Amino acid sequence: MTPFNSLYNKGIDKIKNQDVIFCSIVRDCAYNLKHNISDIEKIGSYFKKYTVIIFENNSQDNTKMILQDWARNNNCVYIHIANYEEDRFKEIPIPQGYNSANCKRRITKMAKYRNQYLEYIASHNLKSDYIIIVDLDVAQINVKGVISSFGIEQEWDVIASNSYSRSPHLKRRYHDTYALIEDGTENIPQSEKTIDKNRYLWANINYNMPFIRVFSAFGGLAIYKYELIKDLRYFVIDNLYGGVEVKCEHVSLHTELQKKGHNRTYINPNMKIKYQNTLSTIFNKIKEFILR
């Protein structure tokens, strides 16, 4: 039996009498949302009980309708639908020389939106063993990989995904390097250069490799011990270096966890999250070539 299959079988046994809460924020993700709903329900079926909390905002596609249908058909699902006035975030200036993807304006918004599900858990006094935070716009969630995370024998606080995508040149890359902070480098400022370099340095993580200790990671899906993060909130951490104005909102949770002595964060190589379909990447590349 491979290490992956062994972890999967142990994970099944570990969680059969435990509870989990899935949390997500979504916007304009109708295309991938349908099959990801099925995967969330599959993962949830391994647990004694599961709850889904989703905050949607400002979608222009069929996301709102899909979510409302899901909530009607599954009483484990809570959906909050909204159209927010987002001009207030535009009042936060983006300083010259900083990337808009890594700026205070964007991360302030992301932190505010993500705090909604943590505040919902607190205000409704929800209890659980685990909280799984997931991006429902990803192309594919490896269900078996998620369950394998619970089979690890060493103590852990957070387990993040092995996320991957293809570059414009179709080269495999680790996708979520903005949220990735290597163990021991948490006091070193990030830069656009290191974020980009890590996409390829971390590209070849594969099944059956040992879990990798990091300071921070997300990867589109991460598992947290409920008791450790139920009272935490996302916030903005200045970076102010190398084109990166602030750190990713996920880093703020790990910063608080470390302060409390809960810094055992790992990437599970088996818990693969595919961010985009290769065919869509090829299509966009062809489209770009035609429109030159």
Q: Where are the language model's segments positioned?
A:
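C-terminal catalytic/acceptor-binding lobe
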Residues: A203-R292
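A conserved acidic beta->alpha catalytic loop
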Residues: F55-I66, N83-R88
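Active-site-proximal specificity loops/subdomain of glycosyltransferases
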Residues: W70-S128
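Conserved catalytic core of nucleotide-sugar-dependent glycosyltransferases
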Residues: V138-V236
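Cell-envelope/extracellular polymer assembly enzymes that use nucleotide-activated donors
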Residues: D19-I21, T51, S252
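N-proximal low-complexity "stem/linker" segments adjacent to membrane-targeting elements
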Residues: M1-K42
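Acidic donor-binding/catalytic loop of UDP-sugar-dependent glycosyltransferases
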Residues: N62, A111, N115, E119, ...
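Short, acidic, metal-binding catalytic loop of nucleotide-sugar glycosyltransferases
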Residues: S38-K49, S59
